[in-house]
């Protein structure tokens, strides 16, 4: 994973995603809903919820909206019932794609996802058709914009906390954990005053698929089309993106 920085790819696509700010509160609301549904509504013990709330606040989402979605997820407030669904398939050039959605209308969402694949040179597969090509890992980014953090110190602290790998990047350090160790590592780092730019349990491809310039352009159009859906939460793929 050291040669394929998720953080760099996040930064690379941020400007494009910022152009879709009209949907950003809906995305944050669903992130908060998922985190609270899976781990409870206590920010002190639910690192995923804490991260989702921090990201929402960074985009100026009102506190009332945040609280309302936590209450919906934990059952203390009536509202729409959302269902998590995972789609698997292939993009142009045989790129493996996993799409995580949260929807209150699975028929609508299935049609949107299927249309995005078909229109952009991909095809949906059965459950399990590509998921075996990915590993589930805890992923944490420690900010180091000023370059003041010492790599040896961070590495020792991260390993002490339970991380399995530390990768220095420009302006940040990426940490990887086993999923079951993720919460404890986040807690340890926060208690030791590290600033976390990102933290989540997510998927990483075991191998990467390098495409021709033409096929890569088609693949990026597929990703953009999927991101246009309000229901799509995460898109995982094994494309080796060119610089």
Curated annotation (Swiss-Prot):
Q: Which PANTHER family match?
A: TRANSCRIPTIONAL REGULATORY PROTEIN YEBC-RELATED (PTHR12532:SF6), TRANSLATIONAL ACTIVATOR OF CYTOCHROME C OXIDASE 1 (PTHR12532)
Write down the species.
Answer: Oceanobacillus iheyensis (strain DSM 14371 / CIP 107618 / JCM 11309 / KCTC 3954 / HTE831)
The keyword Ribosomal protein appears for this protein: no
Q: What is this protein called?
A: Probable transcriptional regulatory protein OB2038
* Molecular function GO labels: DNA binding
Q: Do you know which Pfam families this protein is assigned to?
A: TACO1_YebC_N, Transcrip_reg
Which family is it part of? Belongs to the TACO1 family.
An example Gene Ontology CC term for this record:
cytosol
GO aspect biological process, one term:
regulation of DNA-templated transcription
Q: Which UniProt keywords apply?
A: Cytoplasm, DNA-binding, Transcription, Transcription regulation
Q: Which domain of life is it from?
A: Bacteria
Q: Where is this region: Disordered?
A: 1-21
